[in-house]
């Protein structure tokens, strides 16, 4: 696919590390060529926003070898693992290849994806649960500094706990990082917080898409109050080992509620803001909103920023991500897909007994 460098179902980690596509990517980046795999970062940078590429080039500068070439030693300081699509939520910005729970009403909306040429896998994906996978990770462990877990929902994936157990002997030198809905901190016999305490640090990107009513609407099956309680437990148990942020996925559903969401993250969750963008499918992209709603949101964002003094790092992050989202919102006119967004939203509301307008009344004249 457009952003796949290798598949460890067909090769080992080590083979993928210096595979043909990986070599070409390194060669392009070292030569200043914009490789197509990195299109999201290039697009954000062209809009004047700070991309993940730019941010990591600063925060992880100490991990970059002095001598880089297209073939590199098999030493991986940062490893991100997406091992399955097991998940207990049906987030509107998601789909079955990333959430098994989405299968409940997928048949009602899959034609919307197919209409834009997107076909999704709809099977439970647990193909990496084998001895070779664990052996490869243990082989890498001595040079690892950060292991990142995503999903699916990693905290309900048994393989995730298997990996944690394998890494525990190296835990004093490894930090673990998560993209998680934090709906569970215990899973079967596994005590997540107890395991985390054996590692150097724990970095959590909370998957949360708004203040409680908005988050619970977008992320079907979510209970934001449970998330807040679990977050308090994690912070209390881990102390200085913990760091985290609220990683809102900016979509057409939460454009209007962004200021209230950031206010909740800052003052209730006591957590710095972060952000991702729902680039696709195109019909949930924030850019599908009509001009009038974009103007309303833009005015709301500017008014909110006037109340947030950029005098500390957390407030500076609010300014950064509000401006990034505002720039993205207004960068393109994709309003030709707005009717599809409304239709898709209506179908899910009927299937899930929810009401978008009840949560975001600014859309009442459009539905």
Positions of the model-derived regions?
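Membrane-interface junctions of multi-pass transporters
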Residues: 2-43
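Local cysteine-cluster metal-coordination motifs and their immediate loop/turn environment
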Residues: 34-46, 86-96
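Recognition helices and adjacent regulatory flanks at domain boundaries
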Residues: 46-77, 87-89, 128
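Eukaryote-biased activation of long, low-complexity terminal tails and linkers
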Residues: 116-131, 140, 145-147, 169, ...
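Leucine-rich repeat
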Residues: 134-140, 164-169, 193-197
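Distinct, well-ordered alpha-helical segments
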Residues: 159-165, 187-195, 257-261
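Conserved C-terminal portion of the radical SAM core fold
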Residues: 175-177, 198-205, 224-366
């Amino acid at each position: 696919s457009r952003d796949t460098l290798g598949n460890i179902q067909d090769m080992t980690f080590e083979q993928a590390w210096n595979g043909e596509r990986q070599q070409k990517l390194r060669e392009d980046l070292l030569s200043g060529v914009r490789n197509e795999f990195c299109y999201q970062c290039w697009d954000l940078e062209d809009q004047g926003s700070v991309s993940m590429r730019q941010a990591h080039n600063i925060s992880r500068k100490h991990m970059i070898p002095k001598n880089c070439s297209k073939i590199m030693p098999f030493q991986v300081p940062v490893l991100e693992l997406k091992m399955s699509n097991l998940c207990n939520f049906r987030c509107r910005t998601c789909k079955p290849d990333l959430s098994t729970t989405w299968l409940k009403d997928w048949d009602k909306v899959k034609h919307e994806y197919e209409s834009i040429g997107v076909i999704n896998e709809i099977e439970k994906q647990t193909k990496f649960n084998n001895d070779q996978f664990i052996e490869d990770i243990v082989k890498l462990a001595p040079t690892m500094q950060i292991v990142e877990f995503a999903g699916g929902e990693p905290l309900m994936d048994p393989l995730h706990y298997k990996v944690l157990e394998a890494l525990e002997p190296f835990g004093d030198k490894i930090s673990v990082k998560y993209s998680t809905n934090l709906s569970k901190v215990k899973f079967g016999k596994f005590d997540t917080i107890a395991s985390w305490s054996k590692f150097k640090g724990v970095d959590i990107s909370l998957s949360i898409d708004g203040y409680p009513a908005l988050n619970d609407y977008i992320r079907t099956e979510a209970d934001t109050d449970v998330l807040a309680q679990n977050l308090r437990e994690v912070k209390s148990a881990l102390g200085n080992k913990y760091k985290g942020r609220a990683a809102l996925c900016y979509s057409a559903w939460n454009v209007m509620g962004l200021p209230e969401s950031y206010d909740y993250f800052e003052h209730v969750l006591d957590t710095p803001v972060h952000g991702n963008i729902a680039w696709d499918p195109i019909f949930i992209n924030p850019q599908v909103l009509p001009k009038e709603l974009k103007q309303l949101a833009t005015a709301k964002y500017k008014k909110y920023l006037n109340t947030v003094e950029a005098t500390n790092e957390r407030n500076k992050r609010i300014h950064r991500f509000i401006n990034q989202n505002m720039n993205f919102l207004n960068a393109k006119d994709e309003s030709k897909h707005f009717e599809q967004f409304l239709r898709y939203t209506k179908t899910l509301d009927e299937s899930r007994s929810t009401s978008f307008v009840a949560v975001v009344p600014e859309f009442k004249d459009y539905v």
